[in-house]
UniProtKB/Swiss-Prot annotation:
Motif placement: DEAD box: 360-363
Gene name tied to this protein: DRS1
Organism lineage: Eukaryota, Fungi, Dikarya, Ascomycota, Saccharomycotina
Subcellular location: Nucleus, Nucleolus
Motif (Q motif): 206-234
Full protein name: ATP-dependent RNA helicase DRS1
Length: 725
């Protein structure tokens, strides 16, 4: 049979055919390249040699060591819409430059630079609760000598610092809330037999070849430099390929995204070739994480023919997404709100043929903020589907998981719960009553850690306005900084991430928006400027560094609140409980005199900071006015077309949204609703109007009316008694 006839035979099949022992005549069905034109007989031999050299690099070799990711891999792409013209925005750096900032690292002379490089080991961490000091590569003898020399040089002043760095966290556990755990009977009834998860974790796959994956998927993994599956990938991929539901947890940076993308792409190799439909939905809590997951999938499946991806996230062009979803891509990565919007308002998009649902960062998605959206999505998706849940802190209770309609899921927890990554050094700086010095302390730390701007440093803050203010302060001090939070447009957010990734700006100040899932390679340091609300959020924050076996460092500013000390206690306990060496929890010395000197400069900048904020606000108002003017022109110009569009709908009314937020806030504070309020809420739900509540003036008027009635009654009684006499 000729090669042409064999190719025709395979195209009629709806699945990938098995390759026989003789592979010479099998066409490359997965290649996206065009077929070369036929050549003369004389060139046939040269042609085969050229094709062979093109398919296989002569210098290629299989890497069988323990490395998982190629060091040449530059990370995932964060690309948004492709627009013809860029949207106008306020250039904050230009305003800061006008005020004298962003010229260079301010107030740093050569002597200080050389001193910071030479004495970095002298300002190393104080041992805390039995943890060693110094870098991991130093021999033990050198550590002891360095410790001795440091203790001789740092006399009375350092004794005070020693007291500061000794954390008294003995009473911090009192503030911890008691969390109800699932009973053994509940777990046995809900989850698959424990033997399945234990067998999955015990089975070790040294390479991806042991997982019996198809050649297009293997080619994509090889192109990314993936050789050895991580423990979470080794355990979950075989179970996912069997079509079973999974609840999986592993430390940050362990390859969870690839753990669900690889089996999904492998399954889609066997999809019907002639029927276009959306078969996989991946839900993420943030837009940046969705864009990253889409890029992971595209790069793993780049050699799989006819595999399509769609992105449905907020902040990007709605019409472009609608046009893309019309093609019914195989895999749609979405955020919950925009996903529901497209299901309800995009006529050509439906989810009737969805076979796999993935919820990334599942514990965050199960919180109150996403609960209503998640319930709506579950009601729209087919009940017969495979559901995969992944998170670094997967501690959700069965009561929360019931709403996801899981069918005896296999529970795979690779690492102990609530544990940071290995090779992470966790440092703590006790602030005491010096909160006003935190901006100056942050500047001094960054200057000491990275005087030349060649390291990637992420700074986490609690509030958006603080992130913006810190960007201005550090910019005035000559430091290039980007910010990432919810007040920025999606284009600004992606621009900040890309500039940080390419080291155009070495410092990224962000809220917890960036604490989950984002995998930017070679983040050396994470600084917690504000303490997170919980230890779980802390783990996600520090998980931005020390990823995939690399070393990393986190520095946390700790106040006097019991909740903050409790997080420090949990971090120390996590390191103590860790059986793998490499992670440390230590205190860090700070030269507070130098911080005070920097703070004098920062205080003198207060008026300049306010002037910059005012100028930025004015420019934003001008741009907003221009945008409104352009919007009005478009409404007049395209009036008929705009009015003919159907009105977009949502599954909740404004009143229902408000009630949902109130109930969510009550559940967070754990306040029980008393019987009076409960009856009133029930009456409102039944459609009855709220009864009128008397005011103080109403009660006073009632009292006066009652007194008049009593006076009249008393007068009548007296008149009757006189008549009888």
């Amino acid at each position: 049979m000729s090669l042409k006839m064999k190719g025709k035979k395979y195209t009629d099949l709806d699945f990938v055919p098995t390759i026989s022992d003789s592979e010479e005549d099998v066409p490359d069905l997965d290649s996206d390249e065009e077929k070369p034109k036929p050549e003369t007989k004389g060139k046939k031999k040269n042609k085969s040699v050229d094709e062979e050299s093109a398919d296989m690099n002569s210098g290629f070799r299989f890497n069988t060591d323990d490395g998982e990711i190629n060091t040449n891999f530059d990370g995932w792409e964060f690309l948004g819409d492709e627009k013809d013209e860029e949207k106008k925005d306020v250039d904050l750096d230009k305003i800061i430059r006008k005020k004298g900032g962003l010229i260079g690292m301010a107030h740093v002379d050569e002597a200080e630079k050389s001193e910071s490089e030479e004495s970095e080991s002298d300002d190393e961490d104080l041992a805390m609760d039995g943890f060693g000091m110094g870098a991991q590569e130093q021999p033990e003898g050198e550590e002891e000598d360095e410790d001795a020399s440091n203790s001789e040089q740092e006399s009375n002043d350092e004794e005070e610092d020693d007291d500061e760095e000794t954390y008294d966290v003995g009473d911090a556990g009192d503030a911890e809330e008691k969390v109800e755990e699932d009973t053994a009977e509940e777990m046995q009834a809900f989850y698959a037999p424990e033997s399945e998860s234990e067998n999955a974790k015990k089975e070790v796959h040294k390479t991806f070849n042991d997982l019996a994956l198809s050649r297009p998927v293997m080619k994509g993994l090889s192109n990314l430099g993936y050789v050895k599956p991580s423990p979470i990938q080794s355990a979950t991929i075989p179970i996912a390929l069997l079509g079973k539901d999974i609840i999986a947890g592993a430390v940050t940076g362990s390859g969870k995204t690839a753990a669900f993308m690889i089996p999904i792409i492998e399954r889609l190799l066997y999809k019907p070739a002639k029927v276009a439909s959306t078969r996989v939905i991946v839900l993420t809590p943030t837009r940046e994480l969705a864009i990253q997951v889409a890029d992971v999938g595209k790069k793993i499946g780049q050699f799989v023919s006819n595999l399509t991806f769609g992105l449905a996230v907020g902040g990007l062009n709605l019409r472009q997404q609608e046009q893309m979803l019309k093609t019914r891509p195989d895999i749609v990565i979405a955020t919950p709100g925009r996903f529901i919007d497209h299901i309800r308002n995009s006529a050509s998009f439906n989810v009737d043929s969805v076979e796999v649902l993935v919820i990334d960062e599942a514990d965050r998605m199960l919180e109150d903020g996403f609960q209503d959206e998640l319930n709506e999505i579950m009601s729209l998706l087919p009940s017969k589907r495979q559901t995969l849940l992944f998170s670094a802190t997967m501690n959700s209770r069965i009561k929360q998981l019931i709403s996801l309609s899981l069918k005896r899921p296999v529970r795979i927890m690779i690492d102990p719960p609530k544990q940071a990554a290995t090779k992470l050094t966790q440092e703590f700086v006790r602030i005491r009553k010096r909160d006003h010095l935190k901006p100056s302390l942050l500047f001094n730390l960054i200057r000491k850690l990275d005087p030349n701007g060649q390291k990637r440093i992420v700074v986490f803050v609690a509030r958006k306005d603080m992130a913006h203010k810190l960007r201005i302060i550090l910019g005035l001090l000559g430091m290039a900084v980007a910010e990432l939070h919810g007040s920025l447009t999606q284009e600004q957010r992606l621009d900040s991430v890309n500039k940080f990734k390419s080291l155009q700006v070495p410092v990224l100040i962000c809220t917890d928006l960036a604490s989950r899932g984002l995998d930017i390679p070679k983040i050396e340091v994470v600084i917690n400027y504000d303490m997170p609300k919980s230890y779980e959020i802390y783990l996600h924050r520090v998980g931005r560094t020390a990823r995939a076996g690399r070393e990393g460092r986190s520095i946390t500013f700790v106040g006097e609140a019991s909740a903050e000390r409790s997080i420090v206690k949990d971090a120390i306990r996590g390191v103590n409980d860790s059986e793998i060496p490499g992670s440390k929890a230590v205190g860090r010395n700070v030269d507070w005199n130098q911080v005070e000197e920097t703070n004098k400069i920062v205080e003198n900048m207060d008026q300049t900071v306010q002037d910059i904020l005012v100028e930025e606000k004015e420019e934003k108002e001008i741009l907003r006015a221009e945008m409104e003017l352009k919007k009005g022109e478009n409404l007049l110009k395209h009036k008929d077309e705009i009015q003919s569009r159907p009105k977009r709908t949502w599954f909740q009314s404004e009143k229902e949204k408000k009630n949902s937020k109130i109930m969510g806030a009550l559940s967070k504070t754990k306040k029980e609703v008393n019987s009076k309020k409960r009856k009133r809420n029930e009456a409102m739900e039944d459609g009855h109007k709220r009864s009128y509540k008397k005011t103080q003036s109403d009660r006073t008027a009632d009292q006066e009316r009652t007194m008049k009635k009593q006076a009249k009654a008393n007068g009548k009684k007296k008149g009757k008694s006189k008549g009888k006499r």
